[in-house]
Amino acid sequence: MAPSFDHLRDEDLDEEDFDMDEVDISDLREKYEVQLEQGYDTFVVVDGLPEVNADQKPKLVKFLLKKLNSVGRVSEDSVYMPMGDNGLSLRFAFVEYSSPAEAAAAVRQLDFTPLDKKHTLRVNKMTDVDRYGREGRIEEEYTAPKIEEFQEKEHLRSFMADPSERGRDQFVMFRGETVGVFWNNEKDQPENIVDRQQWTETFVQWSPQGTYLTSVHAQGVLLWGGASWARLRRFPHPFVNLVAFSPNEKYMVTWSNRPISIPDSGHPALSLDDDGKNYVIWDLETSKPLRSFAQQDTPATGDDAAKKSAKFPWPAFKWSADDKYVARLNQGTSISVYELPKMNLMDKTAIKIEGVMDFEWAPATPRRDGVKTYEQLFCFWTPEIGSNPARVGLMSIPSKQIVRSLNLFSVSDVKLHWQSDSAYICVKVDRHSKSKKSQATTLEIFRVKEKGVPVEVVDTIKDTVINFAWEPKGDRFVIITTPEPVGAVAVAPKTSVAFFCPEKAKGNAIGNFKHLRTLDKKNSNAIYWSPKGRFVVVAAIANTQSSDLDFFDVDFEGEKPEGEKDLTANLQLMNTSEHYGMTDIEWDPSGRYVATWASSWKHVMENGYHLYDFRGELLREEAIEKFKQWSWRPRPATLLTKEEQKQIRKNLREYSRVFEQEDADRISSADVAVVEARRRLLLEWVTWRESMEEELVEDRAALGLPEDPVAELLRQKTAAITPAAGEEQEEQVVEEIMEEVLEESEEIVN
């Protein structure tokens, strides 16, 4: 039992013998000591203010507070505006925010903000002013800056000028620890451009227009390009995992699963405001960070949310087609749209959409009928909440106007699929029965360019759609369906591949979407359209039962079946191939070639690649140990006008004759070169053989041996069997026995 007060001795209560200094409370002091803020992290300096007198000063401060409070909390007492000896202000002010994060936000969002028509605010951190403006840092006398001589830089689009004048495309291969960039030579060995060891630590990635090659390292991201493949940009984001570019290569977002930790010594690019963040958005031109964000916890929504493992959303930040906006989903509550390049939240608030699950920007700037003002569109969907139906909506930015919405019922899941020109968006709706034991899919197709954005419903699909793909720059699409529920099973279920296209209509109108044809009992699970349209590959990816590739032409020039003459497609299976262990497929940007490969990242069996032409003919295959990645280099958009492109298509047959002749000449010259090389090698061998024979004759003569040993042996053997002169040759009798069958019969005895 613990001692009570009554059990204490008198000496235990004697305060005179008690010495406070003998008690060690350092651990308690360290744990509970209040940390007083030190330094000027919460202060900013605002320059560019108008010159006012003492009477005008309060009005200016109140007017300035409207700007300052847009990014944080500032009171009137937190603004100090020094006055000069002449009674007028010095045109700047010191402002104290409630936290360093608010001060950093003020610098980021208010710098270069116009106060009125004549004055523009310049906002800087007090710590920066102290660091760079400290005594001794600034010289008293002005020294003109040294202007370096102009040095011409390499053209970053030089890859568009193929030195062979054959219009070849480039690709990158990552195998083992080596990364190489090559010219595609069809059936021949690829022509190596550059090959480097340890070029990346995880993977490589092209920018959307092919200008940069991205390498990923523990210290951050590097961009490479130009004819010499020099390092062009550096983005220090520690332990970066993923990278995504804006469509026009103006910005980039990096993500790391580890929050950023800024050391006491500082960071070369990031600040304390970025500490604890996972995402960083960068300006590619300046290589500077625009803003950073922390990882979001995905909220649970719906009855089955707890049962389903949450998938990591990537890309978490999605770009508008013109790079003017980037948006982020706050699942279940809102969508935050930021204006670039300042990364200000549009209208200073997120767009509230109750229950929102996903959204997708239009991939091209839309041109809706009757709408002449600038806009970008994104499509979003919300699930059924209580008695409210699920909803799909099209929102215009920056007006935030809902231009079209659609209510849906009995919804299990929704996927959004934009067509490349933003002419359509297909909303793939997985619906469940009342018992929730079976599922079926309907396709809700929004015709975005038509007046009023009409919606066409394709509800003839009885099974669940597991894959959907629009034809690029076209209006046909392919789906893959399965009657069985999709899940982790030992044997993948059989699938069906269905083709859809519009029916013919008068003028330039697009008819209703009709079913073209279905191919049953397939193992396919992936669809890959040519970037130029018309040709499509349907394949079985990462399937242990099958590795088939089917090459289709939807504009076959042969005769159409009678029942399909009113449709805008003519389907033809051109070829079927197989690549065992195939994990990935990618078309080249010209739509002429298809690469398939088996990556060691997914398995280690028969790693390597196959190269096909658009018809499905195998051009080249190569097994490479530890083969990891293949990626075609993208091309920027063409500079030709539509009329120029139309004229080229019109004269394509004439160009084709020239190209075919050039190909034939190249093959012929290659054959001639091979024959000449072989003839040269044969001549060298014959010359060497003759010289060896001459040396051998000389050596035999020196040793007293016959010049031709074979002839000497024959002479000796002939002499041994030939009788000497005057001797009679003994007669020899040769008997020959011959057997002839006159008749043959067969008898069977029981």
From Swiss-Prot:
Coiled coil: none
GO biological process: formation of cytoplasmic translation initiation complex
Domain of life of the organism encoding this protein: Eukaryota
InterPro entries recorded: EIF3B, eIF3B_RRM, Nucleotide-bd_a/b_plait_sf, RBD_domain_sf, RRM_dom, TIF_beta_prop-like, WD40/YVTN_repeat-like_dom_sf
Protein localization: Cytoplasm
GO molecular function, one term: RNA binding
UniProt entry tagged with the keyword Ribonucleoprotein: no
Pfam family, one: eIF2A
Matches recorded under Gene3D superfamilies: 3.30.70.330, YVTN repeat-like/Quinoprotein amine dehydrogenase
WD repeat coordinates: 195-234, 236-292, 309-348, 519-562
UniProt KW keywords: Cytoplasm, Initiation factor, Protein biosynthesis, Repeat, RNA-binding, WD repeat
Listed transmembrane segments: none
A single GO cellular-component term on record: eukaryotic 48S preinitiation complex
Residue ranges constituting the RRM domain according to the UniProt record: 42-128
Quaternary organization: Component of the eukaryotic translation initiation factor 3 (eIF-3) complex.
Family: Belongs to the eIF-3 subunit B family.
Function text: RNA-binding component of the eukaryotic translation initiation factor 3 (eIF-3) complex, which is involved in protein synthesis of a specialized repertoire of mRNAs and, together with other initiation factors, stimulates binding of mRNA and methionyl-tRNAi to the 40S ribosome. The eIF-3 complex specifically targets and initiates translation of a subset of mRNAs involved in cell proliferation.
Protein name according to UniProt: Eukaryotic translation initiation factor 3 subunit B
Originating species: Chaetomium globosum (strain ATCC 6205 / CBS 148.51 / DSM 1962 / NBRC 6347 / NRRL 1970)
Gene: PRT1
